Amino acid sequence: MFSNVPVGVQRAVAGVALATGVALAAQAEPEGAFLSRFDTQDRLGEGWQVSHFTIRTDDFRTAWTRDAIAWTAEGLTLSLLPAPEEAETPFHGAEVQRVRRTHYGRYEVEMTAARGMGVISSLFTYTGPYYGDPQDEIDFEFLGRDTTKVWVTRFAKGERLPGQWLDLGFDAADGPHLYAFDWLPDRIVWYVDGEEFFRVEGEDYTLPDIPGRIMFNVWAGGPAQADWSGVAPEDMEAQAEYRCISYRPPESSAPMCSDPVPGG
């Protein structure tokens, strides 16, 4: 997400996290494997927190609120909604963050992307200056203006590296699909529905190497993101659904979203 958000906004977001003490937890040793199936429970479970704050800058048009998160038969729904007239931003959106950091390993999400001009839905890892680190980031970002594609990118040691907007071969807003990436010391490989989709090699590019925090969110692009996401009209409403998120370190055989559901 933060690869396309102005630096001042990035600092504001991270500053809020620092003020709430999350940064202290993030400095702990990276956590081990976990599997969160949102389609079989009605709560986030241990290890997650919901963002609930406003970023006071004209460059970012979305305030995070707990009220934009709900459970349905499909899993965890994150919504983008027009904010009330008295609100400080035009939109209310939703964001969920992992409390502890993760590092090298496999990351998976089963989700349905949000559709709509200027809408962004995502899964990514992030750390940055307010955690005492240079910015490192790995992303899957769905631009609601064309959900037959996905934006994959990474940030390493504070350097913005080239992103790719790639054809999926299907519409990611029509239903759930499995998205994954392997983050390893010498490469990052993105996957879609179990098939290799895109890769970058360490011999060709600088790669992120600092443990980060898993985040997923839905938000509205504005003039600052116009060339990338488009601008969301002020009456825009959109939803993304998340069924499952999992992580395991290299060499681990812990269960993942891609494994069959027991008894399913």
PLM regions: where:
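Bacterial N-terminal signal peptides that target proteins for export
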Residues: 2-14
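GH16 jelly-roll
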Residues: 29-264
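Bacterial N-terminal signal peptides
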Residues: 13-23
